[in-house]
Curated annotation (Swiss-Prot):
It is a multi-pass membrane protein. The chain crosses the membrane at residues 16-36, 73-93, 120-140, 179-199, 220-240, 270-290. InterPro entries: Mit_carrier, Mito_Metabolite_Transporter, Mitochondrial_sb/sol_carrier, Mt_carrier_dom_sf. One of its GO terms (cellular component) is plasma membrane. Pfam families: Mito_carr. Solcar repeats lie at residues 10-104, 114-205, 214-297. It comes from Arabidopsis thaliana (Mouse-ear cress). Induction: By chloramphenicol. This is Mitochondrial uncoupling protein 2. PUMPS are mitochondrial transporter proteins that create proton leaks across the inner mitochondrial membrane, thus uncoupling oxidative phosphorylation. This leads to a decrease in the efficiency of oxidative phosphorylation and an increase in heat production. May be involved in protecting plant cells against oxidative stress damage. The keyword Transmembrane helix applies. Belongs to the mitochondrial carrier (TC 2.A.29) family. Its main location: mitochondrion. It is found in: Mitochondrion inner membrane.
Length: 305
């Protein structure tokens, strides 16, 4: 009779496939929240005659409602194709490389719980490596998401994700695809460390509590916690990254940081915090839950008699 025997580990390619699939599924589910976050981050203070500010987008729910009203429901999924491009590459690499890099840091003979600082270092490295490769997809996603409702007769900059890649290269040069790479490396390395290392550590801690095991509940709790840490730590860098990618008037990362701080104050770096947390918390819960379940499929050995 045919049967299955559990495997101890899966290959890098299998991990890459699992990670890319889980990241794409989470992206598809949560990109409206990401679109709201980008719009809030790119929004600047608008002076009026009486000295007050009347922002177009107010809060996560208000932003979602405004986009849906002005641009239709499909407007909430702007940049989804580029987002899926990004997750296939970035999601697959950052998670797929995490375990091999951890093993490289501690040695293949290591037995026991890997120290937290080693997990953080591994996640920092894989996040940086992955986004260097995936930066063009991130740039295109932000450019597409940043376009709101345009006045009558004003054409859109890009017809879609593929057109955006070609248009950017044609008008701005190949190097433009890596615009904002500096803050993007910083942001994604830090957020990746906050997500992967915290998920790893929290899951490990939860499973030491009586009656808790490697279950759906454990994955959900650890995923939500990972999203919270990621937003708290990465939000300022995320704002700078979004502004540099969505607005070419900034000379560099420092210029963007100084101008934002000078004109809008420190709280500008936490614009879109609620939709960002709602999105990342949900994203991480969905992604890690999906990842754990898909990996279980690969962790079953090939059918044998």
């Amino acid at each position: 009779m045919a049967d299955f025997k559990p495997r101890i580990e899966i290959s890098f390619l299998e991990t890459f496939i699992c990670s890319a699939f889980a990241a794409c599924f989470a992206e598809l589910c949560t990109i409206p929240l990401d679109t709201a976050k980008v719009r809030l981050q790119l929004q600047r203070k608008i002076p009026t005659g009486d000295g007050e500010n009347l922002p177009k987008y107010r809060g996560s729910i208000g932003t979602l409602a405004t986009i849906a009203r002005e641009e239709g429901i499909s407007g909430l999924w702007k940049g989804v194709i580029a987002g899926l491009h990004r997750q296939c590459i970035y999601g697959g690499l950052r998670i797929g490389l995490y375990e091999p890099v951890k093993t490289l840091l501690v040695g293949s003979d290591f037995i026991g719980d890997i120290p937290l600082y080693q997990k953080i270092l591994a996640a920092l490295l894989t996040g940086a490596i992955a986004i260097i490769v995936a930066n063009p997809t991130d740039l295109v996603k932000v450019r597409l998401q940043s376009e709101g409702k345009l006045p009558a007769g004003v054409p859109r900059r890009y017809a879609g994700a593929v057109d955006a890649y070609f248009t950017i290269v044609k008008l701005e040069g190949v190097s433009a695809l890596w615009t904002g790479l500096g803050p993007n490396i910083a942001r994604n390395a830090i957020v990746n460390a906050a997500e992967l290392a915290s998920y790893d550590q929290i899951k490990e801690t939860i499973m030491k509590i009586p009656f808790f095991r490697d279950s759906v509940l454990t994955h959900l709790l650890a995923g939500l916690a990972a999203g919270f840490f990621a937003v708290c730590i990465g939000s300022p860098i995320d704002v700078v990254k979004s502004r540099m990618m969505g607005d070419s008037t900034y000379r560099n990362t420092v210029d963007c940081f100084i101008k934002t701080m000078k004109t809008e104050g420190i709280m500008a770096f936490y614009k879109g915090f609620l939709p960002n947390f709602t999105r990342l918390g949900t994203w991480n819960a969905i992604m890690f839950l999906t990842l754990e379940q898909v990996k279980k499929v690969f962790l079953r050995e090939v059918l044998y008699d």
